[in-house]
Amino acid sequence: MNNFSIISGYKPAGDQPKAIDEIITGLNSKKRSQMLLGITGSGKTFTMANIIERTNRPTLIMAHNKTLAAQIYLEMKSIFPKNAVEYFVSYYDYYQPESYIVRTDTFIEKDSSINEQIDLMRHSATRSLLERRDVIVISSVSCIYGLGAPDLYYQMTVHLEPGQNYPRDKLLNDLINLQYKRNDIGFERGCFRVKGDNMDIFPSHYSDKAWRLSFFGDELEYIHEFDPLTGEKLTQLDKAMIFGNSHFVMPRERINHAISSIEVELQKRLEFLKSQDKLIEAKRLNQRTLYDLEMLTETGSCKGIENYSRFFTGRNAGQPPPTLFEYLPEDALLFIDESHVSVPQIRAMYNSDRARKEVLVEHGFRLPSALDNRPLKFEEWEKFRPQTVFVSATPGQFELEETGGTVVELIIRPTGLLDPECIIKPATNQVEDLISEIQTTINTGLRILVTTLTKKMAEDLTSYLQDLQYKTYYLHSNIHTLERIEILRNLRQGTIDILVGINLLREGIDIPECGLVAILDADKEGFLRSETSLIQTIGRAARNSRGKVILYADKMTKSIDKAVSETLRRRQIQQEYNKKHGIIPKTINRAIHALESLEEIHDNKLDKKQANALLNNPAKLKAHMDKLKKEMFKAASNLEFEQAAKLRNQLKALEEAALKLS
């Protein structure tokens, strides 16, 4: 069994050793819930990594969005290069759910665009959980949504070993049951091809490796791994396991049983609708369901098959659907990052999904069983979650209640950095005073973040500062993903000095060069000026030893009082620690590499404008990547390996950029 092994030039420092020991003690004493209160820059990810290494338990880390999940994934992958670090988020680049608008009698078909790279990573995650224990899965809230049952998924795997008797026709049939497609021309993930005594399989969990099976009659002589692009043999395998090309693969007898159950439910529902004199709804439901049943009978699948998932998994009405949590071993560990956001998000998922589907069922677009194709209810998630460590700088009410108000604090930063000084100034002449503070900060070579309450004020302030010849930019939700990252990069490099926004704490702003955070109208109580929001915003200035925060307010609100008092408490603890240990605070010097993958795109002859257009249009991106794949394989078949390698690099750069920006 592989053990977790951290590969890093750093050792736990500051509050980290104490926090690691306390959390592990709690885990060993069977505490179900613990709270790790980690401030900005305290090394929460590294602390989690050390807890994982010392407990040596399979781990799921939940984040509240894809961007944060991707950041944690990249960090954990660099810390644990020898272990299985996996990424499990929604594989939709674009998703329009099936819905019906009663007021206008409008039915909207489900429309989606699947990201092949993320689909591959989801398969890799479930495979790792079934095959090994040294696994860390970083996931979004996608992990509480229905997935194929793990027992069926594992039951359908094909086990292969050299010397084994495995009739080739049976293997072909088994691969088709696993939803692999035969394609002797375009060899890609989820496909297989046959040539003479050889069969090539491109597993669903790989992007750059395939397997070649060589037969002598019905005997499997050998299996070797090869590069599907160049055909180069990589290594010989003593065994191979082929998992389904979908998490919803199932034996034919299970499909037949499901079809019978669907037919029974259809008849009951039709009788009910007719008894209510809903003849149009009954006719609509009958036509739609019979078409799906015909497709299931002939092909084993149909559009919207997930709406019948209850019958395929063998669950009863109302029972929770199988999710990623059922793939976790009993002794797994769960971290919930930014729990003050993640927990309410988990709580909200079920109700929003239920409301939409009830309308579809009521108006004859779906059978009532479609209601069981859903995310977990909060109470169900509570039951399924293993030992949990909530992680946040601003814990929510649920986490504090679960842990009895006991928190393990990460307040001392390894760099010795202090929480920023907070200054409260009158809001009456806030813009005039802000300009004076901006000039002082710019003179020291640092950057400024300004947060406003409204979009109009942000726009007006940006224009005003630009008229005064300050290098200012307004960061808002309509900015394209590529442009947003370039703006942040320009801010760090000094091309921009001032960034204005409404909710900067939500934008993932992490700028070591930030010397001033200005919060305008800080005394206007509400979501954007709550205690949690203020503490999170104040934390944006905690990456620089000269960072400070100015709150413009004409009155002291409860939120300001609590946020400033908490920041001062932490600052005093940090100052005492630094004085005791002779530590001088050092600004974090982090390399500017956010656009690395995008620069690789440009190096491969894809201009900036084209990259921006592609990354913000999933359909165009997929079409362009499909075109690149075809050109790549064509170049390889013509033995033009240099050209094929260039195309492969461009394709990989696009995939990585899309992942980072998703």
UniProtKB/Swiss-Prot annotation:
Record domain UVR: where: 622-657
PROSITE patterns: HELICASE_ATP_BIND_1, HELICASE_CTER, UVR
Binding site for ATP: G38, I39, T40, G41, S42, G43, K44, T45
Motif (Beta-hairpin): 91-114
InterPro entries reported for this sequence: Helicase/UvrB_N, Helicase_ATP-bd, Helicase_C-like, P-loop_NTPase, UVR_dom, UVR_dom_sf, UvrB, UvrB_inter
Matches recorded under CDD domains: DEXHc_UvrB, SF2_C_UvrB
NCBIfam families reported for this sequence: PRK05298.1, uvrb
Subunit structure: Forms a heterotetramer with UvrA during the search for lesions. Interacts with UvrC in an incision complex.
This protein's name: UvrABC system protein B
